[in-house]
Structures are given as C-alpha cells and as structure tokens.
Amino acid sequence: ELKKRFPHLKGNFGTAWQNQQREFEDIPAPVLFTTNCIMPLRPSYADRVFTTSVVSYPGVTHIGEDRDFSPVIAKALELGGYPEDTLIPGMNGGSVVATGFAHHAVLSHAEEIVQAVHEGAIRHFFLIGGCDGTRPSRRYYTDFAKLTPPDTVILTLACGKFRLNDLPLGTAAGLPRILDVGQCNDAYS
C-alpha cells in the first residue's frame, strides 16, 4: 500500500535496534528515525542520520512540525543508493519483511478480518510484544512464531518483531500472518 502512495519508496532497511551501528555503517542512503531506540552514532554515518517526531539526537538534523523532508531527500540524491539491487537479509535470513499495519491499515481491512474470523479462516490471534534482546540464543519469539498454526495471525509490537518478521509464514484468509502494529511507544491498534 505504501508503494502505491509513494512509488519512490524502496523498502524497509535494518533489523533490530542493537544492530544499527553495524548495519548503518555502509549503506549509501540516509537514515530517518521516527520512533525510539536510536543508538549512539558512529562518525562514519552520523552525517546521514535524521530524526523526526519524538526522536532527536545531538548534532543531528531534526525534521520538525513543518515536515520538510528536503534535507533527507537531498542526502538520498547525493548518496545515490546501491548501484545494483542489493539483498540485505533479515535476522532469520529472510528477504521479505512485512511491516506497516498500524491502526489505519488494520481498520481499512476490518470487515475482511471479522468475516475471516466468523468463517473460521482465522482461528486465533497471538500477540508478540516484548523485547528481543541482543543474544542470538534468545529465540523464544522465533520458535513460538514457527509453531503457530497456519490459520492464525500474529500481531507484533516492540522489538520482538525483529526475531520473526522475515519468516515466510504466508497468509491466513488472504492477510499476512504477521501484522506489525508498531513500536512499544506507538502501538495502539
């Protein structure tokens, strides 16, 4: 849906908060922080970081209430992006990340969701809403998601999503089985 409204949008980049410093090191693009969890910046990419909304950081250009994103766009044009299509895998090695199902998106499909529940095409909803932690051995959310039946939907919020949002879980009743409803500070769907 976002790609229809914003054809220049190329995708979501990055995994969990604890990987920022490594992941942002070499990307030829600006990074715009819209919610929490900004890590101390490394000098190698600090000039490519922008903040907006509730996020700010010393020495970083903040996009204020006027929502003038021209500095971010100018930086993107200056850096040029990757010269070829580049696959950056998720935490589980996946290549597709489903995201962006905040209340507006969910409500726009409310009738379909309710109908699917009434018809039994969706039997249960699971909520995964905790922190993922930094150790690779912390796989509880990943393992849990893999065990959920195919006629269920997983709602994610907070950083726990990064442990499973690239898993190929398919759809239930034509809807993605993983619906990410936001971060811990903006998940009110």
Predicted regions and their residues:
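Metallocofactor- and cofactor-centric catalytic cores in central/energy metabolism, strongly enriched
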Residues: 1-189
